[in-house]
């Protein structure tokens, strides 16, 4: 059994072990694989693991021995699943491994913005507190979350976990979701999109990326928001029109944004959000806590073992 990991570095930069995977067969782990290297490295593989390396129909057709593709992520749009299905190849993903970590990052951004953590750290490094005549140096008010309205777009596991944390802060939680009001706990109010954008103080994106949600947040939606509103995106970068968001931040249409994802990663140097006013960006790391990556590695092993036992789990091909 030949196993090849095409881009293992993101999930395991060296702090975790590949030994259990290597015990399942002849295993080669590459940190990164360029598109031109895929066919050579994947040749003869029965099991192929990828995080972001694209496996399109042409590539899949050129790997006749391939029986299983394991995506080391929840999203699997990098795989031509129709081509895999046609050739009888099992494709699995890693669901729900990072849910607590991503919800935690939502509030890392919210708290950084509302408590101005980065701002005050920067000012202290400049000596402004040292030179202050008062014991408490401040030059901008902080924002209390209790009583504020948060709108959550997409109430899957991460959206629901975000809602639970918000409830703990005493926030009023609104959700745009396909679930009926009867399926929601009483603390979460089902809200239509127009009302959510217009009335919520914070909006957090947790919906999947589809044709209907691409650039869901655009100039028209941003104009619906309050001037003191905050946008959080830990979901998918293309949910947001980036130029529209940069314009809205720079002209004061909304107050701030906290982003963990962008439409292109790594971003181009001319991405307008990199220099936008009150735009705080983390480099797609919400998923990457040590605990989350440990879960990812364990689910990866469980998926492969189930496949080898003839009882695949977490298959994305129905």
Segment roles from a protein language model:
Residues 1-45, 174:
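N-terminal glycine-/charge-rich "phosphate-binding" loop or analogous flexible N-terminal tail
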């Amino acid at each position: 059994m030949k196993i090849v990991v095409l881009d293992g570095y993101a999930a395991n930069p060296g702090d975790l072990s590949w030994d259990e995977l290597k015990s399942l067969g002849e295993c080669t782990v590459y940190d990164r694989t360029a598109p031109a290297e895929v066919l050579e490295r994947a040749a003869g593989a029965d099991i192929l693991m990828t995080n972001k390396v694209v496996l399109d129909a042409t590539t899949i057709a050129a790997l006749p021995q391939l029986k299983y593709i394991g995506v080391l992520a929840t999203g699997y749009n990098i795989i031509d699943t129709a081509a895999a299905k046609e050739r009888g190849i099992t494709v699995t993903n890693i669901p729900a491994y990072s849910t607590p970590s991503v919800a935690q990052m939502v509030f890392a951004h919210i708290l950084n913005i509302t408590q101005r953590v980065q701002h005050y750290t920067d000012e202290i490094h400049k000596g402004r507190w040292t030179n202050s005549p008062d014991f408490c140096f401040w030059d901008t008010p902080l924002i209390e979350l209790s009583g504020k309205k948060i709108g959550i777009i997409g109430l899957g596991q991460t959206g629901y976990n975000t809602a639970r944390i918000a409830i703990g802060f005493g926030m009023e939680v609104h959700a745009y979701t396909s679930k009926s009001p009867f399926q929601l706990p009483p603390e979460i109010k089902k809200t239509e999109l127009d009302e959510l954008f217009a009335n919520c103080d914070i909006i957090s994106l947790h919906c999947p990326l589809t044709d209907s949600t691409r650039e869901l947040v655009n100039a028209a939606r941003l104009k619906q928001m309050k001037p003191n509103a905050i946008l959080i995106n830990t979901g998918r970068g293309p949910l947001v029109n980036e130029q529209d968001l940069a314009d809205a931040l720079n002209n004061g249409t909304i107050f701030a944004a906290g982003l963990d994802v962008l439409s292109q990663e790594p971003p181009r140097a001319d991405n307008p959000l990199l220099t936008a006013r009150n735009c705080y960006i983390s480099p797609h790391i919400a998923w990457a806590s040590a605990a989350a990556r440990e879960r990812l590695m364990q689910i990866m092993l469980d998926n492969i073992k189930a496949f080898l036992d003839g009882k695949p789990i977490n298959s994305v091909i129905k």
